[in-house]
Each structure stands twice: as C-alpha cells, then as structure tokens.
C-alpha cells in the first residue's frame, strides 16, 4: 500500500491519486504481458483496424493479410513485447511493419528503429519501405541520427552498431525511449557473450515497444532463446525464474540437481544466461574438457510458460495450406 500521511494536504492527495493511477496502469500492462497467447482473444477495435490494413508487395500488387495473419497480429498488438516466429515466406516483414505503423499512427512512439542484418536491410527492408512510399532513413554515420523527424522509420544494420553506438545512445536518450524496435532475424543474438549481442542489449533493452521476428528462434539448443527474452523483457518482473531446481554436472560427469537460490526472482542482468542454462539446458563436458550443449530440456513447464506468453510460432503451411509443396 502507498504511505499516506496522517493529515494529508491537497498536494499529498494529488500525488497519491497520480501514484494510484500509475500503479493501476502498470498492473494492467503486467497482466496483459503475462497472458499466454493461446488463452488470449481478439480485440474488436484492433480487428476493425487490421481489416483495413494493406501493403504493396515486391511485384507492385496490393495485398491484404489472411485471417490467420490478422489473428496473430491482433494478439501481438495487445502486448508491448512479442516475438513473431513465422516460417520464411509467411509475411513477417509486412506484419511487423503494420505493428510499427499502428504505434506511429496513434502516437504511442516517436520513431521506429528497424534493426536487421545487412542483407535483410538492403534486400528486404529498403525495397519494401520504398515501394510502400514510407518515409525512412538509413543510418550509416552518427550524423544521420542527429536530426531524425518524428514519424520516420530508421533502418539500421546490425554490423554498423559498433560504429553508431554513441550516436544511437544519444538518439534514444533524446527520444525519451519512446521508440519501437523492430528486430528482423533476431536469432542474430543467440550468443550472449558476443559483442553484437552486448551492443544491441545495451542500446535497445529499455525501449517502450519491441517486436522481434525470425524464422528460427534457436539454431542448436534452447539456451539460445535467452538473449531474445532479455532484450524483450530487460530482466523485469515479466521474466521471473520459476524453476525451483537447477542442474549442473558433477565431478563424475553426471547431471545433479540443487535448489535454485534465485527462485521467484527475475533472471539477473549479470550472467543471467548461466542461470537460464542451469535451469533448462545444462551443458556436459566432452572428453576434451569442452562444454557441450545438448537437446535435453529441464523444467519444461516453466519454460513453456515463458515461451507461451512471448512467442507465436507458425509454419508456412499454416498460412498457405496445401496449395504449395515445400521440397
């Protein structure tokens, strides 16, 4: 409960009302973010909005979303942070573009940052934004980030982050973090120790809205999901470790379990990936003394809860049906 003075003044009462309003809003956001995608229902107002949405494809044809695409996009628009795991060719680019357009239209953010590998920015995003007549700017030097008009898309390559780190940090601060991050091919940050991952987390983890999209959330093992969760949730209360047991290899090279000292707490910002691996995917050392990750998953119910409220997974066949054959 809020601390209330014995004889509150008019100023105290005004502060108390403002604090209670903030607490109610934060609680609503937390409850919405914590809802599992399979349990959510479509919002009628968002449904009407998405029925009017269209985009132009690379052949110059005006396209609309399918019913299933609109259903998934409706659920994503209700949350601040989400990961769209649609298979290649399912329309991820158009979906996350309209998610960003929605935030700009209703002035929830000032700008949209599109972060993608160099090949995706040049071959996908720049042609897509151009053919849809969208205002955008490609950031190649720090000067490009100094005078960015409100409502403009900012296209940024992951390989340029080291060069643009200082200018981007200033831009985020000037915008009061009222930005939307669209991270295309988010599996680029599967290694939590890489410099690229550290740059991306350091610059974008505190933004108001984030949408990640990729066709392959993990490449080898489940531990690679952690950096994407960390970018989305910033080690907040939405990212609580509910695994009561942790696992590690003993001297006899056998997996043994122990109590989790961080149970009920958010994953720590420092070495949180180590705790995530210990909870869900402990490594085993090979005969050469090198740690090797395997496909085993521990505490699967807790992991499924975290994935269920964050990731929407669809295959290309879900959208196209049996019309196409994948060879």
Question: What are the roles of these predicted feature ranges?
Answer:
Residues 1-82, 129, 153, 157-160, ...:
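Charged, low-complexity
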Residues 155-160, 169-175, 194-208, 238-327:
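Inter-lobe coupling linker of SF2 helicases/translocases
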Residues 144-154:
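Conserved motor-coupling elements within RecA-like helicase/translocase cores
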Residues 79-99:
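Walker A/P-loop
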Residues 164-165, 187-200, 221-222:
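Conserved ATPase-coupling elements of RecA-like P-loop NTPase cores
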Residues 88-89, 207-222, 230:
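Conserved helicase ATPase motor motifs in RecA-like P-loop NTPase domains
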Residues 93-98, 108-130, 221-224:
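Conserved Walker A/P-loop ATP-binding site and its immediately adjacent core
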